[in-house]
Amino acid sequence: MSQFPALEDFDDGLVTAPVDDSKNNTDFLEREKLALGEDAGQFETPEDKDALLNFENDSEAEQTRFEQNFPPIDAEMQASGTFSAPKAPYMGQAEVHPPEDESGDPEPVRKWKEDQMKRIQERDESSKKLRESNIEKARKAIDDFYENFNDKRDKVIAKSRKEQEKLLEENESKSTGTTSWERILKLIDLSDKPEAHGRSTERFRELLISLAKDSNAPGAAGTTVSSSS
């Protein structure tokens, strides 16, 4: 934007030329002196003259600065109808700044963000590897558990089967014999043990032995003995 007012503003009366106030003030003082006549000197002091001179000097200095900044339009107009360049540039040349980073962050902040992102990625990768390792260990532990469980179960089943077969064989061997009394003798304990009340079972053992030896003894063939016999 130009520092000079537009010509249209002068035509519309929006901008007016500066008025020399020093001349008006001087005329006013002269009129006052004429009105007072000879008594005007009584009201005049040296300070009044100094103030008037200072005011005139200030007005002249202000007028000079205005004429330097705003020269007459008719003198500055060129043939092309455009304003000439001002004596003093309105603005200095704009300072050229180097292009900033697209992110708008200073270099230390940008570097810190990059390091932070790198640490986060490394931590995520480490967590992922640890998770996969834990899952693999858990699967292996489950497989080992079922493998050991099945192995132990098979061993227990095999042991139980052997013990069952052994028991059946023992029962079969004990139950074999020519007579029922022989099988009974194999199932009972014939050792000489004292009874709790001091009674001896020797007589009973002798009776069972004699019955086992006699193939014709009652009940030797497994038949029920009647009361009449």
Curated annotation (Swiss-Prot):
Q: What is any one GO biological process for this UniProt entry?
A: clathrin-dependent endocytosis
Main location per the UniProt record:
membrane
Taking the record's annotation, the residue ranges forming a coiled coil are none
On this chain, the residues bearing Phosphoserine are S229
Task: Give compartment(s).
Answer: Cytoplasmic vesicle membrane; Membrane, Coated pit
Q: Which InterPro entries match?
A: Clathrin_L-chain
Disulfide bonds, paired cysteine numbers: none
GO molecular function list = clathrin heavy chain binding; structural molecule activity
Instruction: Report keywords, A-Z.
Output: Coated pit, Cytoplasmic vesicle, Membrane, Phosphoprotein
**UniProt record similarity statement:** Belongs to the clathrin light chain family.
* PANTHER family in UniProt: CLATHRIN LIGHT CHAIN
What is the name attached to this protein's record? Answer: Clathrin light chain
Record the organism. Schizosaccharomyces pombe (strain 972 / ATCC 24843) (Fission yeast)
Instruction: Supply the gene name.
Output: clc1
